[in-house]
Design a protein with these regions (language model features):
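Short, small-residue-biased leader/transition segments that mark boundaries at the very start
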Residues: 3-5
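Active-site gating/metal-coordination segments in enzymes
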Residues: 11-49, 157-163
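Glycine- and other small-residue-rich loops at beta-strand/loop junctions that grip anionic moieties
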Residues: 12, 33-36, 60, 88-92, ...
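Structural preference for beta-strand elements that scaffold enzyme active sites
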Residues: 29-30, 55-59, 109-111, 133-135, ...
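Metal-dependent enolase-superfamily TIM-barrel catalytic cores that perform enediolate-based chemistry
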Residues: 41-60, 64, 86-105
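Histidine/acidic-residue-rich catalytic or RNA/ligand-binding cores of hydrolases
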Residues: 43-44, 65-80, 95, 120-129, ...
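His/Asp/Glu-enriched, well-ordered alpha-helical/loop segment
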Residues: 81-109, 156, 177, 183-184, ...
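Acidic, glycine-rich loop-and-beta core segments that form the ion-binding/anion-interacting portion
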Residues: 114-167, 173
Length: 231
């Protein structure tokens, strides 16, 4: 039978859960509201409780939307130099910490997508050591680029979560090497040339990931002595 992931909440509104049990019977293997974070902690608690019962992971875009605000890139030295509104790394790690604690509390199964910060890696590593049922992924573009790459205002590098600092990137590579991060996923999100030709502030988030995924990943990991078999 066909398998797929399903919306976690009705209309991806983050308020009313879908019928997880019926969806699992129909072939759903995971639940997610895609790029819309579940901000309501009680909804996430219930989702994780059911995920433990049904044996399927909850995938939550880990981002505090209030902390993100109208941010355009990673908050730091380069956002200041480029005059672009920054997105603090804690906008991700705060949500990761919440979800990890809820997964531990409920016995649920959580998957953290597109991890981008050192703070998140540290939280995931600690949770795994404590036996929390968790998996995590990184994207090729978060392994390949750092926020200095945005100095050309290339809108193709405007993604969510944003490209982070060199220190964050180095931590992501280390997390693959030691198994804290379980897999690499493209987060493939193409847009038209016309959309990406808008000024940086108005261009949509997302980049093409399929064509360059292996090449970019292998270049960075091989340079850090990670074997092809591990990749």
């Amino acid at each position: 039978s066909d398998v797929c992931s399903s919306d976690l909440t009705v209309g991806q509104k983050g308020k009313e859960m879908t019928e997880m049990g019926e969806m699992v019977k129909a072939g759903a293997v995971a639940f997610s509201d895609d790029g819309i974070p579940i901000s309501d902690g009680e909804v996430m608690r219930l989702a994780l409780m059911y995920s433990g019962q049904f044996g399927v992971p909850i995938i939550n875009h880990a981002e505090d939307v209030d902390l993100r605000g109208n941010g355009q890139m990673n908050e730091g030295r380069w956002s200041t130099r480029l005059g672009l509104t920054g997105i603090p790394d804690v906008s991700e790690s705060i949500m990761v910490e919440r979800d990890l604690q809820l997964a531990e509390y409920t016995g649920g199964k959580i998957h953290i997508p597109h991890v981008s910060t050192a703070k998140s890696v540290n939280a995931i590593r600690q949770a795994k050591e404590q036996g929390v049922n968790i998996t995590a992924e990184v994207t090729p573009h978060h392994l390949y680029f750092d926020d200095s790459s945005l100095q050309t205002y290339d809108t193709n590098l405007k993604v969510a979560p944003p490209i982070r600092s060199e220190a964050d990137r180095d931590m992501l590579i280390s997390a693959i090497a030691d198994g804290t991060v379980d897999c690499i996923a493209t987060d493939h999100a193409p847009h038209t040339v016309e959309e990406k030709e808008n000024p940086f502030e108005y261009a949509p988030c997302g980049m093409i990931g399929l064509e360059s995924a292996f090449g970019a990943t292998w270049k960075m990991l091989s340079a850090n002595k990670i074997s092809l078999l591990d990749v």
